[in-house]
Amino acid sequence: MEFPPLWLCLGFHFLIVEWRSGPGTATAASQGGCKVVDGVADCRGLNLASVPSSLPPHSRMLILDANPLKDLWNHSLQAYPRLENLSLHSCHLDRISHYAFREQGHLRNLVLADNRLSENYKESAAALHTLLGLRRLDLSGNSLTEDMAALMLQNLSSLEVVSLARNTLMRLDDSIFEGLEHLVELDLQRNYIFEIEGGAFDGLTELRRLNLAYNNLPCIVDFSLTQLRFLNVSYNILEWFLAAREEVAFELEILDLSHNQLLFFPLLPQCGKLHTLLLQDNNMGFYRELYNTSSPQEMVAQFLLVDGNVTNITTVNLWEEFSSSDLSALRFLDMSQNQFRHLPDGFLKKTPSLSHLNLNQNCLKMLHIREHEPPGALTELDLSHNQLAELHLAPGLTGSLRNLRVFNLSSNQLLGVPTGLFDNASSITTIDMSHNQISLCPQMVPVDWEGPPSCVDFRNMGSLRSLSLDGCGLKALQDCPFQGTSLTHLDLSSNWGVLNGSISPLWAVAPTLQVLSLRDVGLGSGAAEMDFSAFGNLRALDLSGNSLTSFPKFKGSLALRTLDLRRNSLTALPQRVVSEQPLRGLQTIYLSQNPYDCCGVEGWGALQQHFKTVADLSMVTCNLSSKIVRVVELPEGLPQGCKWEQVDTGLFYLVLILPSCLTLLVACTVVFLTFKKPLLQVIKSRCHWSSIY
């Protein structure tokens, strides 16, 4: 929740002036490289070493950002006495001469961010003191200390907005902002502030917005800026936030205490208008139930506040936590990334106007739903990434979530939800129960069922539009579990076997589905079962991580724009993929990590022409002669390694065997002729019989 730099505001003001020509409109002109239109001179980034002197003298806005001016001399701006806005952002300024602004009586907004004004700060301060009508001043990024800042702001009582962000302020006292009784907005983020003396802001009676983010404040005690409406103290090292205990009305509406080291829920004003409270990423918890209330002396903390010669002692009951804080106007509460193990009784009852509650990434194990807890105005509830094993619904309670629209229960330990939890939840549109080991009820659960929750029933939830059941270990769907809903987004990913190889359990919601994720659900290659023709409004389909060997079927008029077929068993790209009319509207398709055969990707060129984006084109590979080749590197036409496959197989083997047989025959003949005579002699000698005569 940082403030936009003032130079951005000026830039926006400049951009709304259109560069056009026509009746009654000044024509954009170039003056030494600067663009000039309607009294605005834009000289950004022109490598100027000095302020140009040839611009129209009636210019009201001069933008000199990103020019190496280094110095602003007494005569630099004399030619432009009507300036109202001047931006010198990143101009390497280290000196502003004493009378540089002497002729600038109309100047209202001045941006000096990201320069080196600390080097000659006394002379620069003297120049600023002549701007008696200045309202906005940006001194961020100038390496200013608190003494330098005090001198520069001295006597500038007309200021309404000041930025001292990204400087080297460390300790604040009442002398820095003395005399700024009209100041409305103060930006002190990204300094090194570790201490703020009591009364440092007391003179700023009109202050409404204060940004102290990204500093080193260890605590805020006795906070008493009743006129403040916005306070950002995020990204400090706060361990305590204690508002003054006086029963006085506070105007504070937005309080950002996120990304600190708070141990306890902040002690807020007893009477206030707070509607947004940001507490994420702290170390908070509720501790009342963990301590023995019979020992009151062990339940208080005393803060010793030393202000000059005055010492004050503030005593705080540690375990009263939220009881004395006024939360009646609170609408947005973010308590994520803390150490909350439970919500104490009555906590949510103190927030009747609460519409958004974020409790993700805590240690909640159980949540009790009672009357007015959560409040009836709640529209968004995030309980994800906790340790929830049980949700308790008070007996006879109905309509507790009647205005709830978004309910996130993902990444918990739930087995089911209480019967009747979603009764009369007529506004709910989004439910995320992914990564819980739940099961879907095979049939409607009786209203009077009093047993422990063992399943979840989504039937007849007419308002439900988005349902995520990713990684829930669901068994095969039976009996149309989504009947009576009008789902547009459904995620059943990482539930192996949930569809039992067929998409027929989804036909009840096929006409309304727009986004369907069936990643890693065990879909096979049955062509009849993979027909998505009935899903007429489907825009995005994720079928990655399955075992598909052929493209799914799409017929009729289909609105499909994104198709993900990664990590399947596809070996070829059938020609019908390109020729089918429903697929020609695809804008993005994912096809990588499939065992394609390089001899079966003849339609790849046509595929690239018809589909606007093959998102993973560079990662699509195929198998060619036991080698993995990227499809984009294949030569045009049929690859050489595929030509042999076009020849008759019998002829191929004949050609392969015939040379071997001929070689063997010739070898045998040569051997026989070579050893013919010795061989005959051996035969005769061994086969000789003696004569009987």
From Swiss-Prot:
Origin organism lineage: Eukaryota, Metazoa, Chordata, Craniata, Vertebrata
Gene: Nrros
Keyword Signal: yes
Protein name as annotated: Transforming growth factor beta activator LRRC33
PTM note: N-glycosylated.
Ranges occupied by LRR repeats: 58-79, 82-103, 106-127, 133-155, 158-179, 182-203, 206-227, 228-239, 251-272, 273-294, 329-350, 353-374, 377-398, 403-424, 427-448, 463-484, 486-507, 512-533, 537-558, 559-580, 585-605
Signal peptide feature range: 1-19
Record domain LRRNT: where: 29-56
One GO MF term attached to the UniProt entry: transforming growth factor beta binding
Segments on the Extracellular face: 20-651
Annotated function: Key regulator of transforming growth factor beta-1 (TGFB1) specifically required for microglia function in the nervous system. Required for activation of latent TGF-beta-1 in macrophages and microglia: associates specifically via disulfide bonds with the Latency-associated peptide (LAP), which is the regulatory chain of TGFB1, and regulates integrin-dependent activation of TGF-beta-1.
Assembly and oligomerization: Interacts with TGFB1; associates via disulfide bonds with the Latency-associated peptide chain (LAP) regulatory chain of TGFB1, leading to regulate activation of TGF-beta-1. Interacts (via LRR repeats) with TLR2, TLR3, TLR4, TLR9 and probably other Toll-like receptors. Interacts with CYBB/NOX2; the interaction is direct.
Transmembrane portions of the chain: 652-672
Domain LRRCT: 606-644
